[in-house]
Every structure is written in structure tokens, then in C-alpha cells.
């Protein structure tokens, strides 16, 4: 059983005092009870060059008569063992909307997907990242249904606002009303709903909410999670009259989660998901020891898209050259694609407004859709909805397929070259086209990037070695295997960004273990002043990169 050391107790009490004032000692007592009932875990933590995570839904692959989690595990084990060290399994809990992110019950597995046993089996062979959807619950959840019945236990679980309250300073991530009216026996109540009327925000000013969420966090750890993704964590603490984004209360809650995990499961890593400009994003590292160990690298996808749109890596290189980590116990979670669209807000301050507008135009020209958010100046684009393959190459153009594949792989070599742990969305393994049928059927733009496969459909694609899916899966698997063998790609290995325009030039590692990473971001051959062995091809590199070719060079 786990217990808190005097030092941990004092640190926890300090943060609880900030959040709850004189109630803090009582909350600490409850927290100690929760921790004392948790079996102490001491496993290997940290990270290495061997780490890469696949991002996928639990029902990504369907086979008739088989729970999707078992079908997924079979695919992971047969195709990707030794390629990926871990899996980010998107929310696998009962949910009513938002493809899993309107959670009904934090501590149950959706029976349509499988069971906790299926989750634990995946976690035995792959390092599991689970989502803690910490900002909100489904309007159909027992908590909110209790609130709607005026159950005293749940009256403080949600945020209600009086009519006429000035909320003009609140940051809005969506072009939807912030408040949703609900009828209760005691009358109509205006409830805070940041993301949608079906996603009711939790009230962390009530310590009971914090304790329930920490119980959910430990449930995931108990069932094998080695990483916890803190979904939309920047929104969790509200103070009227502020932006209600990235407030000190949110950071205190992350610090509390870190302290609890340090006490009971120090191998578990926190990953903050804050789709925000870089400065706010990296604030969730805290001092490098007291908040999240990993932070999502949200500027990377729009910057890579800009790089290949212009054939110029200078903006990407300039941004990457300024990246620093506060300690060796932190690193970046790098990604180019995920279940969401390509967010353009994080590129603000790096790209000019007209450059962001050009990305929006390209997405539309390539068959994508654009989601907007509300601002005082009206709706503005925040997300481009289409697959990464289609974002980089126009699916309607007569450009050669092999050139499109080369461009796509070059973009992903950038992902694998940069300092951090790479997360690879499952559709990036196949170069999937946008799912227009899924969008038309649902009306949900993000469904363009969320196609679910039947097992037979996927196997048919991969059985043809000349297919796009087979070519990209083979190439990507090779890249990840090569990467895992070289300490220069350790998430904390040194990184130098060299002057870059048509070729992105990165040096990882140092001394005789250094690797020069060169990625041609144009459709023309480029010359680089470096020769040596190309780890990707296994052949001697003589200094000329073909269009969209990448090379990892050692002396």
C-alpha cells in the first residue's frame, strides 16, 4: 500500500491550500485514504530512443464477432511489435458524443469495445497512454443526471452562472454558446459547457470533483497505463473576469496529480494537451520537475504543412532552434496528425496571418473542412480537418503518386528527427485519404480524419505491396526501427538546428554518435555539404538529395 512522505504531504497541502483554503487539511485526509488503498508500484519509467507511440481509437479496426480491442491488439502484435513501444488509446470509456470525449463513466470500458482485461493485455506488450478527460463529462453521465435531479451530492459538481453575468473575457475554443440552459426541479440553470452542450464542465472549486478525478486517474494506472494524457487541461479552473485558460488553479491541479503519482506510481508520465501558443503550452512543464513530463508540440503540424506548401524550412527551423527543455525529466510529445484536425492557432506568432490564411486555403483546395472558434472580432479558423496525406498533397492533382508518398514520408522524417517522443496517428501509417463519406454521413468535419477500418479492408490494402498503404507502412516501420537503434534520437539528446531553407538540417546527438538529419522539402534535387553513411538506406550518401528525400547521416 502507498503512503505519503512528510515532504509530499506538505507539498500537497500547500497546493490544496491555494485551491480550497481552510478545507485543505480535510481534503488531504481524503487524498491520503485514496493513496493508502492503492498498491505501490515501482516500475521502470523514463524514455529512450526506442520510444514511439501509435495514436489510435479502440475501435479502429473491426472484425465481425470480435471485440474491437482484441482486433486492435492482434494488429498491434502482428504488425507493429518492435516498431512502436507504446499506444495512445483514445478514450475507451462509455461516451455519448465527440467520438469518445463526452465520457459517461470514467472508470468503465465501453462494452462495445471490450473490457478492462483487453486493456491490460494491450498494456502488457505496449506502453499505454490513456486519456484523463479532466475538463468535462457527458450530460448523460450519472453525475450530471444527479445534478439535474437536484441531488445534493452533485449540486457542486458543475458550474452554473447567473443570467447577465459578463463572460466576455472567457477564451472560446468553439463557435458555440458558452452556457447551456438545463431544466431542474428548482428551475432553469445555465451550465458552463466549454466544448458542446453534451460536455458539461466539472467544477474543481469543489474538492469532491478533484478527488473523483484522481480516483479515475489511479484506476487507469491500476489497469496498466504508463502515460496519462491530460485532455483540455488548460480549461479546468475557472475564475469569472479572466480568460479561464491556463490559470494558476489549473497548474496547481496538475502539480497535485504529479505529486500523487510520484507517491504511488512514479513511473507514470503526465502528458499535457493544451492546444495553445507555444509559451502557454510549455508552461505545463512547470519548473521541470513538478508538472507534466511531456507537452504536446502543437506548433509542429501547421509549421510542417507550411514548410511543404512553400518549399522553405526557414520558419520551422527558426522555431525549432529556440526550443529548450527545463530539465532532463521533461521532453516534447511530437506529432503531425491526430484524431483532431491540424490546429493553426499554435502557429500564431510564428507564421504571419497571411501564411496561416494560405494553409486554410490549401486545406479547402485539398477537399478539407475548416472549424472556427469565436473571438471578440468574430469567428476565426482554428482547425483544418482532413488527413495529413491530403493536407500535404492535393488528392485531385495529377502529380505522381510516388512523389506524393515521398513528400509525406519526408514530413514524417521531420517528426522522427526532432527532439522528443514521436506520436504517430494510425492513418499516417497508411497515407489514408480523407473520409468524405464519413463526413457526409455525420456532418462532423473531424470525421474526415477518423475513418474506421474493417479488418478485411485493411488486410486487403496491405496485401498489395504496390498499394500506398503497404508502401508507407513498410517505409514508416523501417524508419522507426532504424531510429530506435541510435542514441542520437534519445528524447533528451542534444539538438542543433542548422541554417535551413530548401533542406531542413538538424544535428542530433554529439561526438561520434551524432546524426545529421537532412530533409529536402522541395520537389527538386538539393545538394548538401555532407557525406557519410545514410542510416535510412544503409548506403553511402554522396551529397545529393532527390526531391523530398531524407537522409540520416553518420560519419
Swiss-Prot record:
pH dependence of this protein's activity: Optimum pH is 6 and 6.5 in phosphorolytic and synthetic directions, respectively.
Gene Ontology terms for molecular function: glycosyltransferase activity
CDD domains (UniProt xref): AmyAc_Sucrose_phosphorylase-like_1
Catalysed reaction equations from the record: (2R)-2-O-(alpha-D-glucopyranosyl)-glycerate + phosphate = (R)-glycerate + alpha-D-glucose 1-phosphate
Thermal characteristics: Optimum temperature is 42 degrees Celsius. Retains full activity after incubating at up to 55 degrees Celsius for 10 minutes, but only 35% is left after incubating at 60 degrees Celsius.
Pfam families registered for this protein in UniProt: Alpha-amylase (PF00128)
Keyword vocabulary terms for this entry: Carbohydrate metabolism, Glycosyltransferase, Transferase
Positions of the catalytic residues: 231
EC number(s) from the headed UniProt entry: 2.4.1.352
GO biological process: carbohydrate metabolic process
Uses in biotechnology: The excellent specific activity of this enzyme towards glycerate opens up new options for the commercial production of glucosylglycerate. This compound has been reported to be an exceptionally potent and versatile stabilizer of proteins at elevated temperatures.
Superkingdom, natural source: Bacteria
Physiological role: Catalyzes the reversible phosphorolysis of glucosylglycerate into alpha-D-glucose 1-phosphate (Glc1P) and D-glycerate. May be a regulator of intracellular levels of glucosylglycerate, a compatible solute that primarily protects organisms facing salt stress and very specific nutritional constraints. Has a very strict substrate specificity. Cannot catalyze the phosphorolysis of sucrose or synthesize sucrose from Glc1P and D-fructose.
Family the entry assigns: Belongs to the glycosyl hydrolase 13 family. Glucosylglycerate phosphorylase subfamily.
Name of the featured protein: Glucosylglycerate phosphorylase
Protein's organism: Allomeiothermus silvanus (strain ATCC 700542 / DSM 9946 / NBRC 106475 / NCIMB 13440 / VI-R2)
